[in-house]
Amino acid sequence: MLPSGFPRQASAYVEVAGVKINFSMPHVESIGLGGGSIVRVGDSEVTVGPDSVGHYLSTKARVFGGDVLTATDISVAAGQDIGTKDLVKDVSLRTVTLAEAKIKALVERVVDQMKTSPEPLPVLLVGGGSVIAPKIIAGVSEVIQPPFHSVANAVGAAISKIGGTVDIIQNTAEQTIAQITEKAKQMAVDRAVAAGAKRDTVTLAEVDAMPLQYVVNQVRVIARAVGEFSSDAFYSDAAVNNFSAEDDDEIYSEESVKQSQASIIDPRPIVDVDTYRPNVVNNPKTGIPEWFITETDVEWLAEGCYVLGCAGGGSPFSEYIKLRDILRAGHTIRVIDSSSMKDSDVIYWGGHMGSPAVSNERLSANETEESMRELMEYLRHDSFDVAMSLEIGGANGLQPLLVGSSKHFDRPTVDADWMGRAYPTYWQTTICVYEPGQLVPCALASGDGKAMIMTKTTNDEIVDRALRAACTEMGSRVGMTAKPTTKKKVIKYSVLNTVSLAWRIGRCIARAKKHNTSSTVAEQIIDEVGGPDSAKVLFRGKIIGVERRLWKGHSYGEITIQQVADDELESASASGYKTVATGGVLKIPFKNENIYAKHVKDDGTEDIVACVPDLIAVLDTQSGKALGVPEYRYGVMVTVLGITCSPRWSDTPKGLEIGGPAAMGYKDVVYKPLGNYVEPKSVVLEYAPPK
C-alpha cells in the first residue's frame, strides 16, 4: 500500500500463475496458506498446505468438531481463542512449533517477494486467516492487525469507487489521436458519473492508445475513470430486482469438481546471483576460450538486451523461450571474443526487420535463419565461420545465438555488434559509417515461404527503404541477412563486447531482484557501465501519456512522463544518484527506439537532456526491467536511464549524420554527449581459464 492509501500497481510485467498477461492490476503475490490450510505431521517434518479445507473450515477443523488438522487448529493450540480449545489439547508441542516455523517461513518469503527495498517495512494483516500469521516477521518493522481485520473484504467493497470504461476503435484519417483520446477520456468520465460517481472526484486510472496492426488509420483507445460513490445517485427498484438472491445462492452452493492436476515445476536450477560464474572453457582443438551459454546466461542476456534496445529491437521474451528450449533439448550455444577470430573467417550477420508492436503480438519463426540460407545459396557458401548480431538491442541481440546454436549452424557468436544499441534501420550501423556499401547482397525471408534477394544499390539508405516496403507487404516482420563481413572490419568498425555488456546489465537486474533493490537498479547499471561519468538517471516519474502509430514498418509515437507526488512513491529514499531533471514532465518521442528526452519544466521552458546516438532506456521502477514500445502504458512508474554511446557514433560527423537526431527527422536537435564512453569488459576473457 502506498502512502496515498491506494494499493501499489503491479509492474509493467504482470504474471498470473506464472503466465505473463497484458493487464493492469494491483501487485498481488499469492501462496497456498490460510486458516484452512491442512497440516500434515510426518516422522521428520510438518507440512502446511498448500491444499485447504476452504469454506468447510467451520465443520472440518478440529476446533470446530471436525477431524482435519488445520493451520487454525495450530493457532488455537498456540494460544488463540477460536472454537473449542480442548479439542486440540492433544496436539504435541513439537507439532505446534514445527508448524508455526513453517507458517513463518512461508509468510516471510512472500513478504520478501513484495518488497522493492531491503529496509524493514510495516505489514498490515487482514482477513480471517490473518490469525495464523506470526507476530514477528523478518524484514518487517511492525505487524498491524486493524479493527475489523477479519471482514476486510466487506469493508473494501463498501468503500470501493465507481468506474467507467471506454474501449473504442476510431479512424485517424479525419481526426488526430489526441482528439480521439480526449473523446474517450470524456466518455469514460461520463460513464463513471452515470454509474453513480461524484463528478468532482472522478480521475482517470488508465488511458492507452494502440494502433491496429495490418489496418490503415485505425487506432484502439481504452480509457478507465474512477470516482467516489455519490449517495445522491438514483437507482430504480427494477434495477435492484434484476439480481436474484436465489440464483446467486444456487451458483455459490454448487460443489466444484476437483481434478487432479500435476504440479508445474520450473526445471531451472536455483542460482546464487552473487557467486555465479559463466562457463568459459578452452576449446581442446583450437585452444580458443569459448563461453558456453546456460539458461541463467540467456535470462540475463535477454534482460540486458532489452535495456540496450532503448525501447526497440523487439521484445526478447519469445527469443529467450526459444533459446531456453534449445538448451533443454541438449544443444549448445557458444560466444567467443573478437580477438579469437581468424583473419579468414566468414562472418554472417543479420536480424529481424519490422515494427516492435507487431513483434509483440506475432511470434517469430525461423526468419533470420531462412534469410541466411537464402544468402548462402546465392553466394554459394556451404556454411560460415562466425555469427554476429546486427544490433545488441532487443530481440535482435539474441538472433546470432539462435542461428549459431548446434540446433542450426553450430557456429560461435562473436562478442560484438554494429550498433551498441538498437536503431530502426539497417543503414544506421557503424559499418555504414566507416565503409558504405556493405549491406548488399542481402536476403529477406518472411518465415512462411517468401524470400527475396537484393543484389545492388547506389546507397545504403535505399536498401532499408526498399526492403522495408517489402517487409510491410510480407507481414511487417521478416528476417534479413546482410553481406558477410570479416574479422578486420569487425575489429575496426563494430562496437565490441556488447554481448558481455548485455549480460552484465541482466545480472544487475537479477541481483536487484534478489536483494530487493529493484528501485535502484538504474544506479547499479550505471556502476556497471562505467559510473556516473558514463551514464545518468535522467528522470523519475509516471507515464501519463502514450501515443503510437504504425507507418512503413515502424512504430512512431511519444510518451509523456510526469514527476509524481511523494504520496505516490513507495520509498522516499529510493534513489542513489541525483536525476538530471526534476519537476515538470519528460517527453520521449520514438521511432521504434527512443530518440531524445525533452524536459518541460513547470514554467514551460524546455531542455533536451539526452538524445541519440546516446542510449535512452525507460525502466520499470518496480521490477528494474526495461520497457519497450509495446509495454509503454499509462500509470506505470518508470526511471529513465541515459547511457553514453560508443565513440564509433560520436567521433565523426558521418557517425552523427547517420546515428544522430537529424537522421531521425529532428534536424533542430543538437547532440551533446551525455558523458564518456567506457568499453565493456569481455566476459570471455575475464572468466577464461588459463591455457
Regions found by a protein language model. Name each.
Residues 1, 132-134, 151-154, 315-319, ...:
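Short glycine/serine/threonine-rich phosphate/pyrophosphate-binding segments
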Residues 2-34, 149-161, 322, 328, ...:
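Catalytic or ion-translocation cores adjacent to nucleophile or general acid/base/metal-coordination motifs
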Residues 2-201, 205-246:
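Helical "lid/coupling" subdomains associated with nucleotide-phosphate turnover
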Residues 42-56, 61-64, 71-78, 299-351, ...:
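N-terminal low-complexity or amphipathic/hydrophobic leaders
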Residues 151, 158-280, 547-691:
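C-terminal non-catalytic interaction/assembly regions of soluble proteins
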Residues 338-383:
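Glycine-rich oxoanion-binding loops at beta->alpha junctions
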Residues 434-518:
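Core active-site phosphate/anionic-ligand binding loop and the adjoining beta-turn-alpha structural block
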Residues 507-570:
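Oxyanion-binding "anion nests"
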